[in-house]
From Swiss-Prot:
GO terms for cellular component: mitochondrial inner membrane; mitochondrion. One of its GO terms (molecular function) is metal ion binding. It comes from the Eukaryota. It comes from Mus musculus (Mouse). A motif (Twin CX3C motif) lies at residues 36-59. SUPFAM superfamilies: Tim10-like (SSF144122). GO terms for biological process: protein transport. The modification N-acetylalanine is found at residue 2. The twin CX3C motif contains 4 conserved Cys residues that form 2 disulfide bonds in the mitochondrial intermembrane space. However, during the transit of TIMM8B from cytoplasm into mitochondrion, the Cys residues probably coordinate zinc, thereby preventing folding and allowing its transfer across mitochondrial outer membrane. Pfam families: zf-Tim10_DDP. This is Mitochondrial import inner membrane translocase subunit Tim8 B. The gene is Timm8b.
Length: 83
C-alpha cells in the first residue's frame, strides 16, 4: 500500500474527525431521549398523547439549546485564548 501524502493524511484526519462528531452527536441525542423518556412518559402505550409528545419535544429542545449555548461559549473562550 502506498504511503499517504500530507494532503491525503490531513483529509483522512478531517474525515475521521467528522465521523467522530457525528457519532458523538448521535450518542448525545440518544442520551437526551432516554432522560426525557424517563421524565415524560408515565406509562407507554400504543400511542403517545399530546401532553407526552409536547413534554418530550420541549425536553429535548432544552437539552439541545443548552448544549449549543455551552459549545458556543466554549468556542468563544478558546478563540480568545488563541488570539
Amino acid at each position: 500500500m502506498a504511503e499517504l501524502g500530507e494532503a491525503d493524511e490531513a483529509e483522512l484526519q478531517r474525515l475521521v474527525a467528522a465521523e467522530q462528531q457525528k457519532a458523538q452527536f448521535t450518542a448525545q441525542v440518544h442520551h437526551f431521549m432516554e432522560l426525557c423518556w424517563d421524565k415524560c412518559v408515565e406509562k407507554p402505550g400504543s400511542r403517545l398523547d399530546s401532553r407526552t409528545e409536547n413534554c418530550l419535544s420541549s425536553c429535548v429542545d432544552r437539552f439541545i439549546d443548552t448544549t449549543l449555548a455551552i459549545t458556543g461559549r466554549f468556542a468563544q473562550i478558546v478563540q480568545k485564548g488563541g488570539q
